[in-house]
Amino acid sequence: SKEDLCFYMEKIKKISEEMVRDGMSHPTMFEIETALSFLYFLDKKVDVVLLETGMGGRLDATNVVKKPIAVIIASIGMDHMQFLGDTIEKIAAEKAGIIKEGCPVISYNNQESVNEVIKEKAKEMHCKVTFVNSEGIRVLSESLNGESFSYRSSDGRWYEKIEIPLLGRHQINNAALALEALNTIRNYYCISEFQTEDGLRKTIWRGRIEILEKD
């Protein structure tokens, strides 16, 4: 709410001013937003937080969680090269910087050189890594109303028909990644297949290939 936003911004403003007085740099806008979200989640006692990095991973403001339930790495491309590196492998190494000791890693099935970087980091941190089974995706339908697909997960679990209202083949790949992540999270939370399928069916991403109006 607007009241919550003002309350936490006042707290962070006070701390930011103290940091500057002590000779430290003023937090960036993203660092402020990250701190605000952590304070809010703590006070509201949320059950689960799906935390997205701002850029990269290793040096990202969000990369302070010591023991996440799982680490999820999505598709890796040539983004933010001036900060993350000039090759896909260097960028992958920065992204893999969110991998924590002993935490399960679930990753999009990127090109082999990228997968190798992720596997190497996971091995170093004693983590089990699971990749999306790209061969297990079968597109059933694609339209302006959304997509449907079947999926055989990496552990053999069969999803006969998953429906998502999001547009684009990449969203099918993202949904498969979400399914793999949920398979891991089931070790901690009771999540039924109905809840999984219903959640994906109701997923909304405002402003991302969103149809605003139809004739």
Which role does the model predict for each range below?
Residues 210-215:
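Short, intrinsically disordered, charge-balanced linker/junction segments flanking boundaries
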Residues 166-179, 204-207:
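Short glycine/threonine-rich catalytic loop with a Thr-x-Gly-x-Asp
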Residues 56-59, 133, 165, 208:
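Glycine-rich, charged/polar anion/phosphate-binding loops
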Residues 57, 113, 204:
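Short alpha-helical
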Residues 20-25, 163-169:
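A short glycine/serine-rich beta->alpha loop
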Residues 1-66, 82-84:
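ATP-dependent carboxylate-amine ligase catalytic core
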Residues 19-21, 44-52, 68-161, 175, ...:
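Acidic, Mg2+-coordinating active-site environments of NTP-dependent enzymes
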